[in-house]
């Protein structure tokens, strides 16, 4: 923990609960809720860290290997959902858009964005109901052994209609 006013760092000893992320890149701070949220997209598990009790509120441990290494994920404050795109797992890149609802009992939505090649290590930002996705590494087939490449392109995805638009693309080696 970084204390900005004192310019010092501190550690919090976790006393209990389940951290549901099975790998370190499945954690997000949600400023609108002042919460640290651990997530597991394969199993649709979530756990909130309570800094006062120093415990994770999750009770179920993850058991599956996941398919979303180095995905991009944003919090959507309009409906309290998590919006994820892409990732890597089991020797495949993916182009799945996942919309998850950690604060309510709503099924996770899986949408294949076939207009975008499968990839991981993308960047994204949410502006109103539009998700912008930039770059990444992957390949058209999604199979890691078939000539992966870096992407330098920008897409917009309307979260209501799932309409995908390619806004621009730079050369492969800018």
Q: Where do the PLM segments sit?
A:
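Short, conserved, GDST-rich strand-edge loop motifs in beta-rich repeat architectures
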Residues: 85-89, 134-150
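Short coil/turn linkers that define WD40 beta-propeller blade boundaries
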Residues: 6-7, 44, 54, 80, ...
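Beta-propeller blade signature
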Residues: 46-51, 94-105, 146-163
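Entry beta-strands of beta-propeller and related beta-repeat scaffolds
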Residues: 33-37, 79-84, 129-134
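Beta-strand-rich domains and repeat architectures in extracellular enzymes and scaffolds
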Residues: 1, 14-33
């Amino acid at each position: 923990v970084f204390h900005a006013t004192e310019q010092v760092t501190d550690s919090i000893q976790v006393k209990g609960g389940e951290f549901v992320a099975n790998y370190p890149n499945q954690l997000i701070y949600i400023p609108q809720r002042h919460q640290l949220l651990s997530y597991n997209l394969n199993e649709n598990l979530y756990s909130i860290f309570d800094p006062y009790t120093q415990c994770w509120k999750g009770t179920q441990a993850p058991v599956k290997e996941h398919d979303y290494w180095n995905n991009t994920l944003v919090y959507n404050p309009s409906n309290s959902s998590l919006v994820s795109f892409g990732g890597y797992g089991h020797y495949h890149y993916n182009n799945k858009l996942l919309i998850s609802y950690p604060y309510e009992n709503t099924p996770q939505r899986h949408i294949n964005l076939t207009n975008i090649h499968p990839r991981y290590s993308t960047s994204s930002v949410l502006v109103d109901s539009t998700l912008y996705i930039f770059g990444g590494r992957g390949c058209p087939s999604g199979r890691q052994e078939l000539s992966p490449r870096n992407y330098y392109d920008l897409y917009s995805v309307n979260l209501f209609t799932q309409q995908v638009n390619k806004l621009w693309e730079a050369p492969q080696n800018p």
